[in-house]
C-alpha cells in the first residue's frame, strides 16, 4: 500500500521526498514536508505545498491538502476498498513479499549441551525464531543454526557430574563434589539411563568419562530440541564445535596469512587491538590447546564459507566484550566483518505473585524454559518475551499472563479477533458476503481503523530492518485497542452501513491473524 502511495506522489513531485505518518490520523494518513524545496523553488513552503496539492485533484489513490508547508494525504475510499478486497481474497498471503536476493544465517540460543534450557536462554530463542519467521515472510532467504559447544571442559564436567550422581544416589556412596558441577534431577535421570545401557563400570572408569559425557550430551540435546519444539521453535542446522576442530590447522594458517598473528611466551595471539579490541587475544595456548575463541573462529570461518549475505548472532548481553575480538578475527580471515551482526539480549526477571519465581529442582538452580511454558502456555511465552526491546531488561509476573481481561495483552488481542468472528456470526454473514461492500459511506473513524489494519506490512518491514521485534506486539495492542474502542462506541449489526463496517473488521482480523502467525501464535476464533 505504501509503495503505491509513494509512486503516486512521486509522479507529481518528480524528486526525492520523505513520507511521514502523522500521529493524528484525523489530520492525514501520510504527510510530506516541503521545507527543503523553499530555496530551490524560491517560494515559501506553504505556497509550494498549495501548488503541489492542486496537482493531485485527479488522483484515484490520495486526497492532498496543504498545511503549514506540508502536503497531507488521505487515502481515497476507492483505493482503500481495492486494497482491502485484495487482502480478503488472499488473506493467507497478506504482508507476504516476493523473494529478495539477500540471504541470512541466524544463529541463536547455542547453549551448552549440559542441561535443559533455562530462563536465560528463552529471550534469545523466541527473538531468533520470530526474526527468522519475519524475515521469511518478507521474502528473505533465511536459515537458522544452533552452535553446539561440545568441545570444551564443560563436556568433561558433564561426564564427571553424571558419575558422581550415580555413585551418590544410585549406589549410596559418599562423594566429594567439585566446586563447579552440574546438578538436578536431569543428571540423575541420565545416570539411570547410562547404568541401564553401560552397566555400573562406566562410572568408575575415568578413561570412559568422555564416552559417558557424549551419552549425556546427546540426551540433553534431545531435551533441548523437545523444549524448543514445545514452543514452536525448530532450528534447521545444528553445528557441532567438536566436528569443526579438523579445521583448526587450516584456519590458523589462514589467519597467519593476514600477518595479524604472533607468538608470545609459547602462545599464539591475534592482534585484535588493531581493530578496536581492548587486548590481543590468545588463540592457541602455550600447551597447544585451542582457546574458546579458536573454536568460535573456526566456526565463523565455516559459516562465512557458506557465503550468506548476512550473518546474525543472537547473544546474551554479557557477551558484549566478545564482539570486537571475533570481528577482528573475521577480518583477518579475509571476510567483511560488517556482514556479521550481533544482537544482544538483556536480562529477564520472572515473578510469581510479585515474588521471584521458584527455581526448578529438575535443573538444580535455574528456572526452566519448560516450566515457564507449562505455567503460562507456549503462546503467552512467545508473546511476552518479545514484548519489550531486547536492549531493555524484561520483568514480568506469570500471574498477569493468566488474567482474562485487558491487563493481559495476549488475551486482549485474541479477544479482538474472536469478537470479530462473533460479530459476523451475530450478523449471520461471512467475509464473502461483504467483500464487495464499498467504503464511500464510511466516516473518518471507520477509515482510520481500516488504515491502522492496513499498515501491518510497514510495521513488519520496520521491525525487521530495525531488529526491534517489540514493534509487532506494540502494533497489535494498539490495533486491538482501536477496534474495541470503535466497537464499543458504534452499533455495527443493524447499521445501515453494516456490510462496509464488517468488511473493515474482516481486514482487522486478517492483520491480527497475520501478525500473530509471524510471532508463532494462533489467533483464537472463540474465547
From Swiss-Prot:
InterPro entries: aa-tRNA-synth_I_CS, Arg-tRNA-ligase, Arg-tRNA-synth_N, Arg-tRNA-synth_N_sf, ArgRS_core, DALR_anticod-bd, Rossmann-like_a/b/a_fold, tRNAsynth_Ia_anticodon-bd. Its main location: cytoplasm. It is found in: Cytoplasm. GO terms for molecular function: arginine-tRNA ligase activity; ATP binding. One of its GO terms (cellular component) is cytoplasm. GO terms for biological process: arginyl-tRNA aminoacylation. It is an enzyme of class 6 (ligase). Transmembrane segments: none annotated. Its EC number is 6.1.1.19. It catalyses: tRNA(Arg) + L-arginine + ATP = L-arginyl-tRNA(Arg) + AMP + diphosphate. It comes from the Bacteria. The keyword ATP-binding applies. Belongs to the class-I aminoacyl-tRNA synthetase family. Monomer. This is Arginine--tRNA ligase. It comes from Campylobacter concisus (strain 13826). The gene is argS.
Amino acid at each position: 500500500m505504501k509503495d503505491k502511495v509513494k509512486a503516486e506522489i512521486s509522479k507529481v513531485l518528480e524528486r526525492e521526498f520523505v513520507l511521514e505518518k502523522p500521529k493524528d490520523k484525523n489530520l492525514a494518513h501520510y504527510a510530506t514536508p516541503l521545507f527543503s524545496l523553499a530555496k530551490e523553488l524560491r517560494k515559501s513552503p506553504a505556497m509550494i505545498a498549495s501548488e503541489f496539492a492542486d496537482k493531485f485533484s485527479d488522483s484515484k489513490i490520495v486526497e492532498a491538502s496543504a498545511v503549514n508547508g506540508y502536503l497531507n494525504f488521505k487515502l481515497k475510499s476507492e483505493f482503500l476498498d481495492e486494497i482491502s478486497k485484495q487482502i480478503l481474497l488472499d488473506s493467507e498471503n497478506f504482508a507476504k513479499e516476493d523473494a529478495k536476493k539477500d540471504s541470512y544465517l541466524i544463529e541463536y540460543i547455542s547453549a551448552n549441551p549440559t542441561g535443559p534450557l533455562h530462563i536465560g536462554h528463552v529471550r534469545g530463542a523466541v527473538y531468533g525464531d520470530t526474526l527468522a519467521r519475519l524475515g521469511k515472510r518478507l521474502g528473505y532467504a533465511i536459515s537458522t543454526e544452533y552452535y553446539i559447544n561440545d568441545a570444551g571442559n564443560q563436556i568433561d564436567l558433564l561426564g564427571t557430574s553424571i558419575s558422581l550422581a550415580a555413585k551418590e544416589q544410585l549406589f549410596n556412596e559418599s562423594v566429594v563434589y567439585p566446586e563447579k558441577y552440574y546438578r538436578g534431577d536431569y543428571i540423575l535421570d541420565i545416570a539411570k539411563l547410562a547404568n541401564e545401557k553401560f552397566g555400573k563400570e562406566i562410572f568408575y572408569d575415568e578413561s570412559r568419562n568422555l564416552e559417558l559425557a557424549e551419552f549425556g550430551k546427546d540426551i540433553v540435546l534431545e531435551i533441548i530440541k523437545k523444549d524448543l519444539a514445545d514452543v514452536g521453535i525448530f532450528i534447521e542446522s545444528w553445528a557441532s564445535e567438536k566436528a569443526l576442530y579438523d579445521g583448526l590447522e587450516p584456519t590458523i594458517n589462514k589467519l597467519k596469512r593476514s600477518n595479524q598473528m604472533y607468538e608470545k611466551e609459547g602462545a599464539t595471539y591475534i592482534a585484535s587491538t588493531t581493530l578496536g579490541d581492548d587486548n590481543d587475544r590468545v588463540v592457541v595456548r602455550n600447551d597447544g590447546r585451542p582457546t574458546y575463541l579458536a573454536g568460535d573462529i573456526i566456526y565463523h570461518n565455516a559459516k562465512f564459507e557458506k557465503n550468506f549475505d548476512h550473518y546474525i548472532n543472537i547473544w546474551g548481553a554479557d557477551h558484549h566484550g566478545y564482539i570486537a575480538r571475533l570481528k577482528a578475527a573475521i577480518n583477518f580471515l579475509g571476510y567483511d566483518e560488517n556482514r556479521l551482526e550481533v544482537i544482544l539480549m538483556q536480562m529477564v526477571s520472572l515473578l510469581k505473585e510479585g515474588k521471584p519465581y521458584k527455581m526448578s529442582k529438575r535443573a538444580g538452580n535455574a528456572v526452566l524454559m519448560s516450566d515457564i511454558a507449562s505455567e503460562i502456555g507456549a503462546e503467552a511465552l512467545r508473546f511476552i518475551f518479545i514484548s519489550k526491546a531486547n536492549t531493555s531488561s524484561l520483568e514480568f509476573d506469570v500471574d498477569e499472563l493468566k488474567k482474562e481481561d485487558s491487563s493481559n495483552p495476549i488475551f486482549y488481542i485474541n479477544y479482538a479477533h474472536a469478537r470479530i468472528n462473533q460479530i459476523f456470526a451475530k450478523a449471520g454473514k461471512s467475509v464473502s458476503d461483504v467483500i464487495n461492500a464499498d467504503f464511500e459511506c464510511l466516516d473518518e473513524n471507520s477509515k482510520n481503523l481500516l488504515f491502522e489494519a492496513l499498515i501491518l506490512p510497514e510495521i513488519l518491514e520496520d521491525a525487521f530492518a530495525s531488529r526491534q521485534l517489540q514493534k509487532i506486539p506494540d502494533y497489535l495492542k494498539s490495533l486491538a485497542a482501536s477496534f474495541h474502542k470503535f466497537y464499543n462506541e458504534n452499533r455495527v449489526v443493524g447499521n445501515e452501513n453494516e456490510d462496509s463496517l464488517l468488511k473493515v473488521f474482516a481486514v482487522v482480523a486478517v492483520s491480527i491473524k497475520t501478525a500473530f502467525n509471524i510471532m508463532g501464535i494462533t489467533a483464537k476464533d472463540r474465547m
